[in-house]
Amino acid sequence: MNPVLAQSSQPRGRSLWQDARARLLRNRAAVTAIALLSLISLLVIAAPWLSPHEFDAIDWDNISTPPSLANGHWFGTDAVGRDLFVRTLYGGRMSLMVGIIATGVSLLIGIAWGATAGYLGGRIDGIMMRIVDILYAMPFMFFVILLMVFFGRNIYLIFIAIGAINWLDMARIVRGQTLTLKNREFIEAAIACGVSTPRIILRHIVPNLAGVVAVYVTLTIPQVILVESFLSFLGLGVQEPDTSWGALVNEGAQDMESAPWSLLFPASFLATTLFCFNFIGDGLRDALDPRDR
């Protein structure tokens, strides 16, 4: 038999990421969630071109009017006559931006802290993780509320404050993964070649945490959005004229009896987005689980 033909007839193996992608695409719930989340993301990005109304413009002839195609207010208007469709999309842009940026902040802190503690080990690991335990015991939501009260409702402060309270779980997860990775052969080979500790962490430890990080991101973004929504519901979140889904839900709850649409549409977008992220996170976790390969 021709050796070339024999070699070409052998089945090709799939990498971890190829196998994970194939399994993720077989997960109908995750695929549907990805499609819905992509649609919502496109809508919030294209908000200025989807409606003739500005998000802060007041239509004095249509105050608290129900949804209608005739007057161009597809989701109706709020209590002061602003178009609810465009405000819902602008609110989604703000909520998603808070979720992504704050998650990025927590990701950077958590990976740096957890990878350093896990790789160095010993007394340094003990001290760093005791600090994490102490921070776990602190009422961080109360801390964030105090920051909002004393320094004002600055949107950048919201990014940093929410991100700074969500890195603790990531630090523990990364530390656990690093403890298993640092005894692998490729790490020992890097040490034998004289590679510095920071380079080992950045070039060999962190890239091998990509699967864990991907799952963490999809599960943390909805948590951050919920925190921001809770702060906005308390009146401590985004300032007018800007808005977010949490702020719109707060406004809609006040007019729920007279104008139920002002609560229905923002709450529906918020709930759908949260469910999408959770389904995607569950799908990624199942796809990357080596026990199911």
For the regions a language model picked out, list residue spans one by one:
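Residue-level signature of catalytic and energy-coupling elements of molecular machines
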Residues: 24, 42, 134
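Short secondary-structure capping/turn micro-motifs that flank functional sites
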Residues: 40-41, 59, 206-207
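Short, strongly hydrophobic transmembrane alpha-helices
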Residues: 29-48, 111, 271
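Transmembrane alpha-helical segments of polytopic membrane transport and secretion proteins
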Residues: 1-38, 280-293
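Residue-level signal for helical boundary/lining positions with a hydrophobic bias
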Residues: 23, 50, 74-77, 255, ...
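Hydrophobic alpha-helical transmembrane segments of membrane transport/permease proteins
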Residues: 2, 35, 43-79, 234-242
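Alpha-helical transmembrane segments of integral membrane proteins
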Residues: 79-293
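Short, membrane-interfacial amphipathic segments enriched in basic
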Residues: 2-20, 70-83, 120, 198-202, ...
